[in-house]
UniProtKB/Swiss-Prot annotation:
GO cellular component terms listed in the entry, alphabetical order: cytoplasm; cytoplasmic stress granule; cytosol; nuclear body; nucleus
Function: Functions as a ubiquitin E3 ligase and as an ISG15 E3 ligase. Involved in innate immune defense against viruses by mediating ubiquitination of RIGI and IFIH1. Mediates 'Lys-63'-linked polyubiquitination of the RIGI N-terminal CARD-like region and may play a role in signal transduction that leads to the production of interferons in response to viral infection. Mediates 'Lys-63'-linked polyubiquitination of IFIH1. Promotes ISGylation of 14-3-3 sigma (SFN), an adapter protein implicated in the regulation of a large spectrum signaling pathway. Mediates estrogen action in various target organs.
Major localization class: cytoplasm
Positions of the UniProt region annotated as Disordered: 353-437
Pathway: Protein modification; protein ubiquitination
SMART domains per UniProt: PRY (SM00589), RING (SM00184), SPRY (SM00449)
Modified residues (Phosphothreonine): 90
Ranges of Polar residues composition bias in the record: 363-376
Gene: Trim25
Cell compartments where the protein resides: Cytoplasm; Cytoplasm, Stress granule; Nucleus
Listed PANTHER family: B-BOX DOMAIN CONTAINING, E3 UBIQUITIN_ISG15 LIGASE TRIM25
Protein's name in the database: E3 ubiquitin/ISG15 ligase TRIM25
EC number: 6.3.2.n3, 2.3.2.27
Length: 634
């Protein structure tokens, strides 16, 4: 099992790289074989150092056998022996000297093949010339080995003696005279050293083979996970595509329903006009027939016949044509249009919110490395509408608008607070209600906005439309409720508690509680008109309902050739300007509203610094005939 391999590394001595044999623990917390650490410190001498972390000990620590580590090593060895091998692979055996050796010539006759090498005579002999080593007592103590090709390699270059020992500490073969220089080492015979190293290498091969198998399985696992990710994302993309298809279907159904209602309204009004037309045609035909009969009688010369027919026609009377007042149901049309506008606003807001979350997610690091991640289809409307419900002001009339994939909003209620637009990076962050910005920060933010270009201001652009429920009866609204002017006659709007009754004013449909918002108004024949903002609680009746003449409204006003800024019935005369477009920047978070004169560039007209306490509405005043205020599109 591959999971045992990391444990084998943890249970290996860092000196001999083998499993612990009688493990001991140093005061610094590292484990070694007792023999390995003892030999290391004997060679090293004081001061003593830990072979792993190199911590210095002036006095050699007393080492005790780590019984817990011994038990762990024993359990590991038992698990290694008991576990079923992954495969039947075993390390290849090392070839013996006899099988590995090639044919060596006899050093005596140089023709026959040697059968033995004498390590004392330092020569190889064939069977014939080897006989003295068996027959003569003088050669009986000479050690014989299988034929060795290069005997010179076995000789010590320093002492010219045969190297018959191996020093594991220095990793080299030595002769008996070299032992003087290796007093602290633990030399062994070549056969013993060869057997030990062969055992270690066989273990190393086993571990390497296991590691290679582990790497192979890891590669397969990575490929498998890669395929799982690909399959999972394919499914998720298909689900996402299905969600968007359903949303498109909902929008298509809403469009079809809205167009059908408009068609029905058109058919209703058109049918009434058609009926009236048929009645008028019939009435006209009757009047033309009567006219022809009268003209015919007038041509009669016979008085008796004239009197007889004239008396009969005298009883037939005609009445002037009357056309009953027939008009489209503007409330219905406005409701349908506002429903579509609300739907578009909800979608834009949800998409921006989703993009913002995605940017924040990418900025904080990629957390999607897990193969099995939670996937939730995008359904932006529910949370957004819930926010809109909580942001509705108490003075705002009308029902709240709802949006869901299955139901189209029927009408955007006046007073719905629009969520603030995302600000640009150079703008100051939002101020919380619990911790208002300091005066210095507010002043810095205000100064920052006073130096912005029109292009930068348009980053905060919001679409404003007039709320016909607030329009005075002398104010005429047109162009999809984006143009206001003074009408010649009363508009006969239906009664509404939010409607202005004293001043010819109108408010924007939506209010703003937080964030930064910018809109522009085009003035045609800019005389006797005003542009500003107000609380929803501003009076609707009496002189105090006039824009700027109360503590709940702020405006810039054109009166004849004079331009003034008004608030709480206090007037501030402003320099005249030829600009016909006014830009209004409202910063709810930092408490100020700025009025700009917009030409090719923007120029400051006036600014109010206020700690706003309620939701704010765009507000407009028109008084002079011919004066028109038009909300500009971006």
């Amino acid at each position: 099992m591959a999971e045992l391999n990391p444990l084998a590394e943890e249970l290996s001595c860092s000196v001999c790289l083998e499993l612990f044999k009688e493990p001991v623990t140093t005061p610094c917390g590292h484990n070694f074989c007792m023999s390995c650490l003892d030999e290391t410190w004997v060679v090293q001498g004081p001061p003593y150092r830990c072979p792993q972390c190199r911590k210095v000990y002036q006095v050699r620590p007393q080492l005790q056998k780590n019984t817990v580590m011994c038990a762990v090593v024993e359990q590991f060895l038992q698990a290694e022996q008991a576990r079923t091998p992954v495969d039947d692979w075993t390390p290849p055996a090392r070839f013996s000297a006899s099988s590995a050796a090639t044919q060596v010539a006899c050093d005596h006759c140089l023709t026959e093949i040697a059968v033995k090498t004498c390590l004392v005579c330092m020569a190889s002999f064939c069977q014939e010339h080897l006989r003295p080593h068996f027959d003569s007592p003088a050669f009986q103590d000479h050690p014989l080995q299988s034929p060795i090709r290069d005997l010179l390699r076995r000789k010590c270059t320093q002492h010219n003696r045969l190297r018959e020992l191996f020093c594991p500490e220095h990793g080299e073969c030595i002769c008996h005279i070299c032992l003087v220089e290796h007093k602290t080492c633990s030399p062994t015979t070549l056969s013993q050293a060869s057997a030990d190293l062969e055992y270690k290498l066989r273990n190393k091969l086993t571990i390497m083979h296991s590691h290679i198998n582990g790497a192979t399985k890891a590669l397969e696992d990575v490929r498998s996970k890669q395929q799982c990710v690909q399959d999972s994302m394919k499914r998720k993309m298909e689900q996402l595509r299905q969600e968007y298809m359903e949303m498109k279907a909902v929008i298509d159904a809403a469009e079809t329903s809205s167009l059908r209602k408009l068609k029905e309204e058109e058919k209703r009004v058109y049918g009434k006009f058609d009926t009236i037309y048929q009645v008028l045609v019939k009435k006209k035909s009757e009047m033309q027939k009567l006219k022809a009969e009268v003209e015919l009688i007038m041509d009669k010369g016979d008085e008796f016949e004239f009197l007889e027919k004239a008396a009969k026609l005298q009883g037939e009377s005609t009445k002037p044509v009357y056309i009953p007042k027939i008009d489209l149901d503007h409330d219905l049309i406005m409701g349908i249009y506002q429903g579509a506008a609300d739907l578009k606003s909800e979608l834009k807001h949800s998409i921006k919110k989703l993009q913002k979350k995605s940017e924040e997610h990418n900025g904080s690091g990629n957390k999607g490395d897990q193969t099995q991640s939670t996937f939730k289809p995008v359904q932006p409307s529910k949370k957004t509408i819930q926010e809109k419900k909580t942001k509705k002001t108490p003075v705002a009339p009308g029902p709240p608008s709802h949006f869901s994939p299955n139901k189209l909003p029927t009408f955007g209620a006046p007073g719905q607070s629009l969520d603030s637009k995302a600000t640009s990076p150079d703008a100051a962050p939002k101020a919380s209600a619990a911790q208002p910005d300091s005066v210095g920060v507010k002043a810095k933010v205000l100064e920052n906005f006073l130096t912005k270009s029109r292009t930068e201001l348009l980053e905060y652009f919001v679409k404003v439309i007039f709320d016909y429920n607030t329009a005075h009866n002398k104010v005429s609204l047109s162009n999809k409720y984006t143009t206001a002017s003074v009408s010649d006659g009363l508009q006969h709007y239906r009664s509404h508690p939010q409607r202005f009754t004293y001043c010819s004013q109108v408010l924007g449909l939506h209010c703003y509680k937080n964030g930064i918002h910018y809109w522009e108004v085009e003035l045609q024949k800019n005389n006797f008109c005003g542009v500003g903002i107000c609380y929803g609680s501003m009076e609707r009746q009496g002189p105090e309902s006039r824009l700027g003449r109360n503590p709940n409204s702020w405006c810039v006003e054109w009166f004849n050739n004079k331009i003034s800024a008004w608030h709480n019935n206090v007037e501030k005369t402003l320099p005249s300007t030829k600009a016909t477009r006014v830009g209004v920047l409202l910063n709810c978070d930092h408490g100020f509203v700025i009025f700009f004169a917009v030409t090719e560039k923007v120029h400051l007209m006036y600014k109010f610094k206020v700690d706003f306490t309620e939701a704010l509405y765009p507000a407009f005043w028109v008084f002079s005939a011919g004066t028109t205020l038009s909300i500009c599109s971006k």
